[in-house]
């Protein structure tokens, strides 16, 4: 069938890609990000490619990764590629490249090149259509920018549900806010999935960027949070399932994200999501652990801080403070975990994480091979990173682990020592001790087992409680019994140790013995077994050193306290049973060290050993018993022999007199032994009972102890003994340095690695050891500094840097204690080393020492004097003088060798000057001479080598400045001022570009000007010139201070010098002033006022302010910033000084205008070659002065001063003011020919008057008005008007004075022949009336009469007329009824003026508007005084005005609106009724304005007034309704075209509706029937055009009537049904005469049907009357255009009738009539049924479709009747009818839900 083929063809056309349709292709490619659619559509691909490729090339320069796309999507071939011509595989490959480019370009989309490049993808490859997801997600991070808006505008309409959130914003073309995006991510899973997939893919391609990742992280985090919040449920089970689903959906994203650890922002985003999951979802411990492990696996240096925060949050969610081992190891590997944890702990809860780390540190103690974990543990408690309760918990973890460590195996000695030290730290720390005691008290720990395991004593613990726990007490040893026997057995086979255990630091068997000894503690049996080992040789202990030396080494080492105590105990036990013929003095040094231990238990046991030794000496029978181990204590070598042993007698004396008396104090105070040793060796024992030791004995004791320090191989006891001896500088004639110098050299020779190894083995601090070693050198040593220097000089790389630093530190410590002569010698030596050519720590250290210590003055002088000599020496390296003079740039030619010498010299000079600078040069004034010589040498040298040498100059100047500043504070300079070289200092200011040098030189000049002004002032001006061009523009605080000081100190000296020379100070300082004014624009804005104020204050405000103001005004004219500065400067002065300044200022202006200028030539450059024209200078100065009068504080200052009557200041002010006024008037009079100067003087005069109060101003004006010149009088009145335009004074005296001034103005109006003067007077009257008229209206009435009279608005001049009328308008507003006397003249003359203003060819818009302004004021304030005749004139003139194109409408319309609002309603209706004909004759505009006036009058007046004047209103409306008929009757003479009539009738209908609202039914119904009769029978039937016109107007009204009032007036339809039927019978849309009537009738019916709520149209009588005539209107559809009209107008009316009919019978009747027009065949009558024309059938089908759509199944109840017709129509000859019936069938099927095929067969 033809119709089927057509459908197929249309479908193919719809899906076609238009490959041959170039226009369609152009439209498809006209979407653009950067061009409008119209512009884009006109571009070809060559143009587009050129633009976009340019952007692409710029991108390639920014990022080389873009270059790969040049071969593909940006190749020239891409211009011809069309996606629609590619196959699926090619398109897929292209998509991959396009999406890769989009991901890469996303980070630069805010750059223009990127947008251009992206536009190529839009224009050529249409990525917004084919790759919509990737395109949107690329641009989405910029959702708030105009760029995203451009993208929205070109996106396809059919966006997928993924991006449905963008649809509303695409339609309205506004940027989406963030909240909807978050909401979509939370609720729309495809959207979030797409975003996540895009971000992960971009990250894998290394294309992710900050904008994308920050956007994604925020959206993803909030979405996850929102999803978890939304899944909250009252039922735990349901909530858990939902949360698990969310977690499972999020974990894969986190897994992918955390796997890309190099992309830090992606990883941090994942951390954020982890935090949200942990806080809002109840995660299981295994999930938390997995997340933790993923986090530590992902962190890098950049993300570790965020990772730790995330870890802390996750750990906080766990019920127990535990973390996986992998996480703990990762934290352990961090560079400084404690610092990083402390940084985050201040902001986040980290307690669980920290406690978990503590638990990790003490986990598997027996398996820990190193001390890394325990070191971290100690640091955690020392750094106090935990809170109080968490610290207690942490201590509990440590203590529990330590007390149960024996269950898992034996702790290493290192671990045991570490933990023992930590527990001792708990007990000793002031902050930790209370917490520790509380933890011990609250825990159920076995303290005994703890002490046993750690071999320490917990002094705060209560021992009895622990001992009660018998089971634990027995359990601990039982576990260890298995360890001790095996170890003991292995040691039993060891032979006797060949030498002392003190003979070497590393003895393998000793470590095993120490371990066995530690295990034996606690069991006497074990200790005895241990003591009897062969290797110890106990049986021969008195003759060989092995046995005792073992215990000495144990208690002297860094072992647990319990172990050391037991060793001491073993020693004291042995000594108590020893024979008395053995001298055990070898033990004394070690016991002395033990007596200074921090542990009281050790000190107690050491005191016991000391007492045992003392007892042996008491019991000794021989004076000199043999010394135990004298030749083998430190081995068989010379070390043992190098010890200076004491005799037994001497040692006995030492014990008796020095050591034993303080036995109890040693136990109580660890520092007591040090004091005793010091006092003993010094010979100043505090105990009066003990006799002092003789000098030889003290020397012997000192040598004895020192020799042990030197020979002892072990460094732990060596350090303790050295600490005791370093308290004593000398004893018995020898010095500490002499005795211990070998140790100093030995330590130096150890080297870095060996020293570190020694300290690590013995667990002592290398730094502490080095500090004690260098203390060996005492300040009383003759060449202490030189000795220290010799230790490290010459420098060797094997030297420990820390040791070198310690040596230099010692130099600094003792420097102040050595004599000055030795200081000088030492300083010279250090200086020599400092200048060595080396970068070694030796040179740096010497320099640092010299910088840190106070170098003697003579040495500094010698150093400084080396500089000029060195400079002279190096100049010999340059070329001959002649060559230097003739050289182009004076550059000294130097070889490489010379350059090295130059570099060395520069380094030397720098060091010397830095040394001087750091040595408080103010304390060494003798340096001044050398420094000035240095300054000269530097200047000379600078000119030779063409170098600024800024740093050296600033150092030299800074030192001189310090000396000079101190000299300023004394009566007499501290140095010889003859050495001052001011020229050099000035050169420093002028020739350097360094701000530091400039500032220092300026300060030095300032200082020198105080102490030696005669040497400085002759060179001051160049300084200020330079300051103006350079220094003043600086904005740092220091430069500000420099400038302030320079002004404060130099300027007063300069002024005083000029006065001493009897020179004019202003002229003399003109150069200075010029420098500052020229520098104004360079001075930072916030400093200008302060700087100039300081300058003027120092110069003298009264003498110099005028000059500064004038120079600024001359140079910068009316620059706003300059004016603000000038205002600030002037405002700071008193009123008298400010006025005096203005007098001098005006004198300067006058001087500049003279033929032979005086001071203005100096200050302003008048008359000079490069000076400006005097007139321009004068204008600038006068305008600036006017600004000053307006904006400075002179007005308030004058008012305040003048308030004090009879004061001297008030007299000065009056005198200066009078002088200024005279000067201004004189300038104005003499310069009238120079218009610019005259105007500027007028501005000044205006501003000057502005400084007066209103009363004083009027007094002055009255005097000036008496002067003869009209020009001055006009100017004065204009000034008064200007003053009144602002906010004049409102106080009562000012108001009365102003009203009293009115007669003066009235006199001018009535008598002056000068129109301009009159105009000015009227303007003043207007302002006075407006501002003050209400105060006393009676005083204004004469003025109103004068204005309304012949002398004002009666004049011929338009300016005075306009001003007068406007003044009358103001008076009407102010005076109200008081104006009635002037009203007759005012109205008559203003009406005449209105008529004059509209004369053809002479229209005067301003006069026209002014008169209407007066009418408006009268309507508002005096509406009752305007008579009917005046209203008629106003309205008639308004009609003329409305017809004029030259005049504006606003003022007239406003007057008419006010008449409608304010005038009596009867008067308004009356004037409209009387003048309606004239309004129509005047044209559409006049008619429209008249109707609008009528409408507003009805609206704004009450209902009662409308009812009262209803007859007149009805008469007006009937006239208005007849407008169409009248205009049609006029034919070609009509003034209204169709549009004008439509517009007028709309207003008439609106007026009628407003009237109806004010009436009731009984009042309106007669009017309606009258109107109906008027429309239907009120005109002869012969007048067909008149009849149609009236009916058209009537039905247009009814359309509005039924549409507006709706169901209220449905019953009124009964009046019009018959006439409607008649009209439908004769009116036709095809007849132009009746078309409008036909349209308005159908529209009226539609409104009437639509709003029927009273079943009016259900009535058969009504329905039958209207249904057939209405449906018959379908017959008018005989052409395509008529069919469209019928479908648009008749079909909706038919549909609304069917809805209103609302019954099956009525519907059947309607359908019967309607179906006639569906069939072309003849009916029974033989006549055509009505559907002969296909357009008619088409219209009828449209009616059926509308009815089906509106009524649905109600209408389809008639389907059986319709089916035959439908069958016929489906075979209709007309293709349009056939297509339309098929649409109707489809519509029916959609409604019924079943096919019609079976019914139609």
UniProtKB/Swiss-Prot annotation:
One of its GO terms (molecular function) is snoRNA binding. It is a multi-pass membrane protein. InterPro entries: ARM-like, ARM-type_fold, BP28_C_dom, HEAT_type_2, HEAT_Utp10/HEAT1, U3snoRNP10_N, UTP10. GO terms for cellular component: 90S preribosome; membrane; small-subunit processome; t-UTP complex. It is found in: Nucleus, Nucleolus; Membrane. HEAT repeats lie at residues 582-619, 1045-1082, 1252-1289, 1296-1334, 1757-1794. The keyword NAD does not apply. The chain crosses the membrane at residues 945-965, 1001-1021. Pfam families: BP28CT, HEAT_HEATR1, U3snoRNP10. It comes from the Eukaryota. PROSITE patterns: HEAT_REPEAT. Gene3D superfamilies: Leucine-rich Repeat Variant (1.25.10.10). Keywords: Membrane, Nucleus, Repeat, Ribonucleoprotein, Ribosome biogenesis, rRNA processing, Transmembrane, Transmembrane helix. Involved in nucleolar processing of pre-18S ribosomal RNA. Involved in ribosome biosynthesis. Belongs to the HEATR1/UTP10 family. This is U3 small nucleolar RNA-associated protein 10.
């Amino acid at each position: 069938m033809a119709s089927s083929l057509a459908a197929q063809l249309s479908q193919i056309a719809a899906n076609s890609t238009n490959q041959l349709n170039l226009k369609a292709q152009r439209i498809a490619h006209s979407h653009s990000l950067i061009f409008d659619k119209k512009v884009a559509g006109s571009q070809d691909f060559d143009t587009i490619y050129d633009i976009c490729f340019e952007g692409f090339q710029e991108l390639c320069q920014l990022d080389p990764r873009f270059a790969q796309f040049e071969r593909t999507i940006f190749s020239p071939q891409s211009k011809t590629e069309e996606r629609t011509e590619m196959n699926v595989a090619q398109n897929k490959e292209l998509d991959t490249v396009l999406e890769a480019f989009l991901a890469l370009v996303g980070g630069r989309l805010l750059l223009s090149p990127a947008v251009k490049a992206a536009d190529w993808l839009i224009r050529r490859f249409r990525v917004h259509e084919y790759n919509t997801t990737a395109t949107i997600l690329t641009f989405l991070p910029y959702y708030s920018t105009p760029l995203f808006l451009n993208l929205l505008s070109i996106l396809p309409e059919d966006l997928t549900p993924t991006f449905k959130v963008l649809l509303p914003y695409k339609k309205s073309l506004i940027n989406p806010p963030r909240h909807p995006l978050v909401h979509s991510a939370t609720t729309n899973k495809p959207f979030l999935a797409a975003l996540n997939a895009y971000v992960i893919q971009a990250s894998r391609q290394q294309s992710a960027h900050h904008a994308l990742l920050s956007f994604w992280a925020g959206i993803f985090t909030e979405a996850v949070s929102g999803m978890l919040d939304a899944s909250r449920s009252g039922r735990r089970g349901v909530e858990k399932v939902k949360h698990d689903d969310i977690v499972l959906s999020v974990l894969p994203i986190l897994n992918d994200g955390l796997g890309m650890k190099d992309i830090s922002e992606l990883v941090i985003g994942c951390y954020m999501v982890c935090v949200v999951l942990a806080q809002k979802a109840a995660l299981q411990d295994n999930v938390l652990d997995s997340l933790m492990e993923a986090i530590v696996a992902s962190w890098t240096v950049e993300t570790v801080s965020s990772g730790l925060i995330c870890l802390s949050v996750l750990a906080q969610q766990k019920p127990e403070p535990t973390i996986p081992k992998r996480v703990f190891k990762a934290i352990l590997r961090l560079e400084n975990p404690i610092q990083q944890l402390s940084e985050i702990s201040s902001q986040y809860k980290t307690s669980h994480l920290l406690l978990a780390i503590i638990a990790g540190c003490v986990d598997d103690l027996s398996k820990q091979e190193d001390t890394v974990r325990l070191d971290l543990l100690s640091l955690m408690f020392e750094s106090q990173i935990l809170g109080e309760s968490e610290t207690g918990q942490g201590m509990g973890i440590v203590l529990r682990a330590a007390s149960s460590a024996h269950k898992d195996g034996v702790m290493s000695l290192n671990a045991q020592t570490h933990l023992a030290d930590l527990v001792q730290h708990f007990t000793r720390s002031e902050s930790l001790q209370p917490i520790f005691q509380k933890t011990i008290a609250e825990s159920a720990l076995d303290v005994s087992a703890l002490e046993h395991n750690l071999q320490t004593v917990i002094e705060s613990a209560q021992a009895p409680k622990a001992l009660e726990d018998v089971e634990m007490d027995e359990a601990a040893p039982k576990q260890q019994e298995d360890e001790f026997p095996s170890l003991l057995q292995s040691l039993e086979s060891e032979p006797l140790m060949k030498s002392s255990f003190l003979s070497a630091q590393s003895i393998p068997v000793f470590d095993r013995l120490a371990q066995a000894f530690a295990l034996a503690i606690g069991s006497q049996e074990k200790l005895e077994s241990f003591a009897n080992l062969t290797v110890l040789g106990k049986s021969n202990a008195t003759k060989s050193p092995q046995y005792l030396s073992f215990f000495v080494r144990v208690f002297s080492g860094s072992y647990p306290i319990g172990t050391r105590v037991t060793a001491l105990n073993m020693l004291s036990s042995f000594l108590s049973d020893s024979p008395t013929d053995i001298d055990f003095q070898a033990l004394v040094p070690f016991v002395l060290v033990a007596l200074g231990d921090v542990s009281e238990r050790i000190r107690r046991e050491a005191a016991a050993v000391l007492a045992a030794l003392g007892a042996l000496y008491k019991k000794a029978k021989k004076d000199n018993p043999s010394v135990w181990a004298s030749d083998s204590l430190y081995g068989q070598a010379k070390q043992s022999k190098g010890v200076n042993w004491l005799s037994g007698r001497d040692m006995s004396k030492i014990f008796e007199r020095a050591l034993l008396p303080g036995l109890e104090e040693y136990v109580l105070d660890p520092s007591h032994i040090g004091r005793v040793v010091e006092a003993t060796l010094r010979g100043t024992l505090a105990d009066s009972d003990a006799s002092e030791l003789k000098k030889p004995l003290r020397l012997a004791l000192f040598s004895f102890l020192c020799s042990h320090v030197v020979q002892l191989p072990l460094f732990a006891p060596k350090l303790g003994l050295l600490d005791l001896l370093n308290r004593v500088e000398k004893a018995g004639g020898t010095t500490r340095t002499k005795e211990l110098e070998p140790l100093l050299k030995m330590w130096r020779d150890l080297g870095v690695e060996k020293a570190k190894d020694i300290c690590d083995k013995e667990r002592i601090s290398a730094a502490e050891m080095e500090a004690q070693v260098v203390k060996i050198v005492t300040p009383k040593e003759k060449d202490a500094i030189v000795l220290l220097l010799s230790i490290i000089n010459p420098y060797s790389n094997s030297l420990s840097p820390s040791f070198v630093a310690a040596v230099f530190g010692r130099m600094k410590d003792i420097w102040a204690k050595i004599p000055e002569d030795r200081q000088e010698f030492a300083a010279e030596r250090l200086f020599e080393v400092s200048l060595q050519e080396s970068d070694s720590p030796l040179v740096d250290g010497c320099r640092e020492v010299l910088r840190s210590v106070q170098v003697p003055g003579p040495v500094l002088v010698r150093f400084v004097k080396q500089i000029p000599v060195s400079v002279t020496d190096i100049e010999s390296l340059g070329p001959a003088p002649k060559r230097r003079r003739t050289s182009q740039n004076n550059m000294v030619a130097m070889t490489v060798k010379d350059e090295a010498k130059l570099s060395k010299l520069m380094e030397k000079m720098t060091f010397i000057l830095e040394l001087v600078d750091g040595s408080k040069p103010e304390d060494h004034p003798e340096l001044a001479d050398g420094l000035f010589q240095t300054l000269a040498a530097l200047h000379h040298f600078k000119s030779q080598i063409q170098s600024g040498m800024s740093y050296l100059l600033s150092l030299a100047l800074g030192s001189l400045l310090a000396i000079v500043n101190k000299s300023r504070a004394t009566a007499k300079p501290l140095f010889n001022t003859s050495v001052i070289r001011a020229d050099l200092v000035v050169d420093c200011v002028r020739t350097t570009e360094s701000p530091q040098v400039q500032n220092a030189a300026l300060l030095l000049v300032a200082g020198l000007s105080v102490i030696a002004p005669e040497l400085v002032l002759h060179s001051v001006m160049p300084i200020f010139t330079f300051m103006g061009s350079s220094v003043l523009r600086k904005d740092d605080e220091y430069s500000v201070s420099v400038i302030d000081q320079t002004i404060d100190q130099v300027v007063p000296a300069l002024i005083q010098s000029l006065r001493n020379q009897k020179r004019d100070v202003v002229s003399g300082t003109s150069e200075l002033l010029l420098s500052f004014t020229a520098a104004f624009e360079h001075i930072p804005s916030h400093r200008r006022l302060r700087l100039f104020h300081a300058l003027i204050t120092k110069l003298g405000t009264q003498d110099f302010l005028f000059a500064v103001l004038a120079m600024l005004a001359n140079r910068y004219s009316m620059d706003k910033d300059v004016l603000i500065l000038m205002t600030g400067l002037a405002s700071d002065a008193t009123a008298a000084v400010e006025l005096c300044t203005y007098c001098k200022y005006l004198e300067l202006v006058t001087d500049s205008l003279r033929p032979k200028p005086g001071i203005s030539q100096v200050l302003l450059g008048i008359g000079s070659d490069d000076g400006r024209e005097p007139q321009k200078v004068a204008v600038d100065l006068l305008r600036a002065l006017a600004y000053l009068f307006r904006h400075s504080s002179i007005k308030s200052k004058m008012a305040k001063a003048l308030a004090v009557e009879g004061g001297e200041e008030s007299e000065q002010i009056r005198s200066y003011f009078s002088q200024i006024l005279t000067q201004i008037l004189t300038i104005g009079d003499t310069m009238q020919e120079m218009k610019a100067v005259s105007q500027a003087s007028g501005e000044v005069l205006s501003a000057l008057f502005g400084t007066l109060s209103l009363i004083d101003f009027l007094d002055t004006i009255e005097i000036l008005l008496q002067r003869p010149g009209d020009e001055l009088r006009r100017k004065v009145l204009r000034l008064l008007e200007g003053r009144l335009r602002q906010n004049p004074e409102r106080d009562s005296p000012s108001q009365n004075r102003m009203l009293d001034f009115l007669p003066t103005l009235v006199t001018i109006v009535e008598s002056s022949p000068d129109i301009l003067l009159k105009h000015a007077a009227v303007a003043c009257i207007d302002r006075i009336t407006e501002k003050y008229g209400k105060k006393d209206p009676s005083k204004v009435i004469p003025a109103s009469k004068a204005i309304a009279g012949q002398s004002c608005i009666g004049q011929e001049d338009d300016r005075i007329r306009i001003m007068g009328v406007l003044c009358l308008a103001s008076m009407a507003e102010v005076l109200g009824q008081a104006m009635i006397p002037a009203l007759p003249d005012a109205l008559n003359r203003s009406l005449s003026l209105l008529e004059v203003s509209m004369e053809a060819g002479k229209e005067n818009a301003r006069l026209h508007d002014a008169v209407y302004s007066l009418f408006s004021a009268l309507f508002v304030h005096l509406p009752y005084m305007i008579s009917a005749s005046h209203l008629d004139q106003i309205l008639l003139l308004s009609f003329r005005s409305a017809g004029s194109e030259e005049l504006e409408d606003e003022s007239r319309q406003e007057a008419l609106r006010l008449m409608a609002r304010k005038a009596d309603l009867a008067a308004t209706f009356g004037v409209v009724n009387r003048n309606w004909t004239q309004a129509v004759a005047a044209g559409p505009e006049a008619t429209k304005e008249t109707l609008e006036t009528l409408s507003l009058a009805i609206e704004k007046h009450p209902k009662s007034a409308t009812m009262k004047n209803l007859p007149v209103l009805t008469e007006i409306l009937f006239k208005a309704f007849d407008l169409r008929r009248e205009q049609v009757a006029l034919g070609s003479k009509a003034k209204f075209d169709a549009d004008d009539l439509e517009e007028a009738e709309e207003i008439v209908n609106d007026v009628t509706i407003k009237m109806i609202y004010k009436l009731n039914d009984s009042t309106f119904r007669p009017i309606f029937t009258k109107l109906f009769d008027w429309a239907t029978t009120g005109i002869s039937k012969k007048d067909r055009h008149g009849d149609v016109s009236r009916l058209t107007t009537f039905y247009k009204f009814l359309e509005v009537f039924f549409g507006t009032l709706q169901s209220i007036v449905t019953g009124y339809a009964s009046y019009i049904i018959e006439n409607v039927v008649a009209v439908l019978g004769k009116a036709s849309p095809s007849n132009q005469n009746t078309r409008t009537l036909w349209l308005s009738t159908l529209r009226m019916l539609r409104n009437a049907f639509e709003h029927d709520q009273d079943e009016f149209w259900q009535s058969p009588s009504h329905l039958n009357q209207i249904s057939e005539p209405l449906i018959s209107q379908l017959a008018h559809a005989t052409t395509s255009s008529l069919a469209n009209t019928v479908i648009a107008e008749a079909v909706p009316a038919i549909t609304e009738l069917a809805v209103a009919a609302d019954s099956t019978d009525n519907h059947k009747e309607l359908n019967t009539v309607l179906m006639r027009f569906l069939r072309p065949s003849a009916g029974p009558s033989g006549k055509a049924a009505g559907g002969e024309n296909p357009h008619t059938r088409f219209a009828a089908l449209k009616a059926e479709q509308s009815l089906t759509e509106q009524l649905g199944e109600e209408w389809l109840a008639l389907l059986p009747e319709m089916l035959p017709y439908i069958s016929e129509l489906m075979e209709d000859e007309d293709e349009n009818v056939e297509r339309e019936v098929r649409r109707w069938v489809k519509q029916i099927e959609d409604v019924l839900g079943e096919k019609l095929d079976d019914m139609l067969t």
